């Protein structure tokens, strides 16, 4: 039986050959919680009568949504996770002392590895598929079950193969590729399916772009996004202290795919997702014609807050100023990224351009804090969702784009093509 990479990963974890559609109970390599979702898991864990974690080294709590605490309620919620982490002497607990957005911090720390089965109580846990792992989001009670047993049940997902061919033009990144996929198949086009990204264009995508690709698989309804390990992955992994030995899997030639999609990336312009769905994608040329004024630009999140995003933004912002009636907020995804950006002089460029640089946080993306939109305000954002009220008031609008578009638009005060700056 020919297998996809996803079927092979599950087969190894279950101990027998499995195929799409089968219900299996799988061992879990890494369980990830955050300050918002983990307290519910902890409550379920305690109510079960459990006294210890099945695999303390395979459980991480990353405090990233409202950290540092934005108010009393978030402070009390954070305290639940802190107390639990200290009580169980959790080795992988990350708060203000070593903070970052979970889906950037976990790969940076080497806590996720190729061939792993990873779950997290956050829908964008699919990000980690970029290193050749099966990674997906689950509910907090599902997380509690894995905390107690080290396992969870799955229906092995069928796979949609996405082949990217050609060489991307200037300022075309993983964000544009995934927005194009979502535009083509819709927000439910990959419902409970693995999106496997392949093709010769992958050779032009660095790991940051690959994380962006897999991060937004969920926005097409995907159970996961996954990219097989290649030389680019291996170079990235060589620079981190991996928690476990990587297990490399590759789809068999002739494996069964639910669908195969081919996209010629050489023909792509930067893609902008208009309100109020990530599938509402249009070309940057169309956005320029539409003359869309903006009140805020945001560069950050688990989708596009990595070092390459900051470098791209700095290259565009250097020697320029943010438009008078526009504000620019930049949120590095981890402290390590922020430190490297500082060493490279990027922070100076941002501040001199009139941007605000925040600590690592998910805050603005979910309309929590550090960039909330007011009534009728419009934002160009590198985040992953633009639903009604996603970043603030229900009458506000969010346009999703890559970091180059966001930076260039901040200077112009309206959505522009970064290739014209």
Predicted regions and their residues:
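Fe-S-dependent hydro-lyases/dehydratases of central metabolism
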Residues: 1-421
């Amino acid at each position: 039986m020919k297998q996809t990479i996803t079927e092979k990963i599950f087969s190894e974890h279950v101990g027998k050959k499995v195929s799409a559609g089968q219900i299996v109970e799988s061992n879990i390599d890494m369980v990830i919680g955050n300050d918002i979702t983990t307290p519910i898991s902890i409550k379920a864990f305690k109510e079960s009568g459990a006294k210890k974690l099945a695999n303390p080294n395979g459980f991480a709590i990353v405090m990233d949504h409202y950290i540092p605490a934005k108010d009393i309620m978030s402070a009390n919620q954070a305290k639940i996770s802190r107390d639990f982490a200290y009580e169980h002497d959790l080795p992988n607990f990350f708060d203000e002392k070593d903070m970052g957005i979970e889906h950037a911090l976990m790969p940076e720390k080497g806590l996720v590895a190729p061939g792993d089965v990873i779950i997290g109580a956050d829908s964008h846990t699919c990000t980690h598929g970029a290193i050749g792992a099966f990674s997906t989001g689950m509910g907090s009670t599902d997380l509690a079950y894995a905390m107690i047993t080290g396992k969870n049940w799955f229906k092995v997902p069928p796979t949609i193969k996405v082949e990217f061919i050609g060489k991307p033009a200037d300022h075309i990144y993983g964000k544009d590729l995934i927005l194009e996929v979502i535009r083509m198949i819709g927000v439910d086009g990959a419902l409970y399916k693995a999106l496997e990204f392949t093709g010769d264009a992958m050779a032009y995508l660095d790991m940051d772009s690959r994380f962006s690709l897999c991060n937004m698989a969920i926005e097409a309804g995907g159970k996961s996004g996954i990219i097989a390990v290649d030389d680019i992955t291996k170079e990235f992994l060589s620079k981190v202290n991996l928690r476990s030995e990587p297990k490399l899997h590759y789809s068999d030639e002739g494996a069964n795919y639910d669908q195969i999609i081919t996209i010629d990336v050489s023909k792509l312009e930067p893609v902008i997702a208009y309100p109020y769905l990530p599938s509402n994608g249009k070309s940057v040329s169309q956005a320029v014609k539409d003359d869309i004024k903006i009140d805020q630009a945001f560069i950050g999140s688990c989708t596009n807050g990595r070092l390459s995003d900051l470098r791209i933004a700095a290259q565009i912002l250097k020697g320029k100023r943010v438009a008078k009636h526009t504000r620019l907020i930049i949120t590095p995804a981890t402290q390590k990224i922020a430190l490297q950006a500082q060493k490279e002089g990027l922070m100076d460029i941002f501040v001199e351009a009139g941007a605000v640089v925040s600590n690592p946080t998910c805050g603005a993306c979910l309309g929590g804090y550090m960039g909330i939109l007011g009534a009728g305000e419009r934002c160009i954002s590198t985040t992953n969702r633009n639903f009604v009220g996603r970043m603030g008031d229900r009458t506000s609008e969010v346009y999703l784009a890559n970091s180059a578009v966001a930076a260039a638009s901040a200077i112009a005060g309206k959505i522009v093509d970064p290739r014209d700056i």
